[in-house]
Amino acid sequence: MERLSSNNRAAPKRRIAFGKRLFGLAFGLLLATALAVQVKAASKKDSDAESKATPTPTATPPNFKPESTTTTGSVTVEGSPIEYQAVAGTLVVHPKGWDDAASAEDWKSKESKEREASEERAEKPQTEEGEEKSKNPTAEASMFYVAYNKQHAEPDKRPVTFLFNGGPGSSTVWLHMGAFGPRRVITADNSHTPAAPYQVVNNDYSLLDASDLVFVDAPGTGFSRIAGKDKEKEFYGVDPDAHAFAEFIVAYLTKYGRWNSPKYLFGESYGTPRSAVLVNMLQHDYDLDLNGVMMLSQILNFDLSVDRPENNPGIELPYILALPTYAASAWYHHKLPGPNSPAALEPFLKEVEQFAMNDYAHALAEGATLPKPDRQAIAEKLHTYTGLPVSYILKANLRIDGGEFAKNLQDATDMTTGRLDTRFSGPTIDPLSKEAKYDPQAAAISSAYVSAFNDYVRKALHYGQDKTYRPGLRLWKTWNFQHQLPGETRPSHQATNTMPDLASAMKYNPELRILLAGGYFDLATPYYEGWYEMHHLPIPERLQDHIEYHYYQSGHMVYAHQESLKAIHDDAAAFIHSTDHLGK
């Protein structure tokens, strides 16, 4: 039998020892793995618990980003050439309650959040999933503008004017292409403008000779857009709309270094109550005084509107203040009775104003107690001033609203009179209707303005190739007309009235100057209504001297009449030169 050497006898013992070590290593590894799994599970459980106790903030990404294109051009204003830079673009604004500091807070890292006190975290609003909500409103507006700046001018020595139309729900295409931009679309003076091609020409009456110009589209109109939760609520209303414009103006002044420029507002139609709220807001809330505010076709107190005042019985002023416009319209269309029609309009209107504020106002104030003979006498006098039949006036109880007047002034020839401009007429749509079914002036010129701007903004300003321009939105049903008056803590439930805002702004800044402009043939916002509002502002008598008045033989869009365009340009330019503190 073979004998084993000593080495051979030791090998089995070494193998047994190695096996024991290998088993121990494997067991240890298995145990470590199990422990690691348990630790990881416990860690995940703790992490989940911590996640629920310490929510991670959900930051709200922006809906929009600012953008712009820049071009250059030249305009000749009353014989003087002006080189300008044009910027077409957008700025992002947020609703009231938005705070950039809170926005930065929303974007903090988790580690930074974990260092905050737990009681502070517990107070923050939670979502159903336990995530922390953003402190800020999520709605945003991207507001479109076109700015024209005179080349090589020092900003501190150059006024800047922010212009906007009204609606509510209107873009600013009208002021831009009809009034003060460097290019102007040609439309017929008092009749329907033929279809395209439209003629766009150098604007001899651009306001660039007096001021840099920023045409701004309200949120949701033109190329402006809104987005986010409750977007309509956050931007479609008297107060949120004015706040958006205030935020836009502040952002514009900052972006383009215009804080030390003389500053103006120019608002038309609903742009006038917007201006009243806006100037007061800028001066009180932003410490930003303005040099002046220009109001075109003003309505500050909606109780004075001649659009269906019969729905507000007992309020007689709309009929009284509209009467001079009825008389001017009858004069223009040769509807005044008798052979001796007044040769000049203004003296005739002074006579009508006196009758309106005295005999007519007293008669309406008497209501049902007005004696029949007096009622008959007032009806005959109204016939003299309006051309409407005495029988119709008596049937209307001496009270005729704007739509009824537009339908009946030229009813004998089945023609409807314009609302925005009574110089315009168009075929009556429904001869049996009580009031006008459309506005012949709007129908006559809207296509020219919208078509011309859509062509101009893309070809000349190189903006909007992939976007839709919205000239107007129907917002009357969704617009929040409640307004929080200065000094009040909650919105008023009365009809919108921004006269207190304008008065507050004038008292807060007693150097503020106001220009009121209106057209004699404006049936939407009768000129005498604006006069009445200004003379009833709750301001000291000396501040009344800070308001100047200009009236033209045109309508709501005064500039649609070329002679009136020149006149309003000259008046606005003189107003700016007299208030810009540049010592010219």
Model-assigned labels for residue ranges:
Residues 267-280:
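Glycine-rich nucleophile elbow surrounding the catalytic serine of serine-hydrolase chemistry
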Residues 42-57, 98-234, 535:
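N-terminal cap/lid subdomain of alpha/beta-hydrolase-fold enzymes
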Residues 512, 526-536:
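Short alpha-helix in the alpha/beta-hydrolase fold that links the catalytic acid
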Residues 363-524:
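Alpha/beta-hydrolase fold catalytic core
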Residues 208-211, 218, 235-254:
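Alpha/beta-hydrolase active-site loop
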Residues 182-186, 279, 283-384:
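A catalytic-pocket lid/entrance helix-loop region that shapes and gates access to the active site
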Residues 553-564:
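Catalytic histidine-centered segment of alpha/beta-hydrolase-like enzymes
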Residues 258-269:
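Alpha/beta-hydrolase fold nucleophile elbow
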